[in-house]
Amino acid sequence: MPFHFSKVMKGQHSEFVAAAWLIKQNYLVYNKTQDNDPMDLVAIERVTGDVLKIDVKSVSFRKTWKPGTRICRVPSKYQKQLGVIILYVYPDGRCDFHGKD
């Protein structure tokens, strides 16, 4: 029987994959400290000091209406005020930022 991630486990896995990907992109990565934080990761580019506030999302694909297309997630109003951006994590480990594919 194949292993199946629970929703929480899938989210945690995606956060670790995203952190590893960001480290490879030359970022320092800091994890959230509370369950209901508006962001999952804070990443600081090592050379420029640019700061990214990131909400990590596991990619989901539509099963009906345009099957196979990615479901686009939208930051909440509060996340938008804070400048949080979405980082998608695909099942194969690829990552990309919302709107920057």
Spans of features found by a protein language model:
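Mixed-charge (Asp/Glu-Lys/Arg
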Residues: 1-38, 42-101
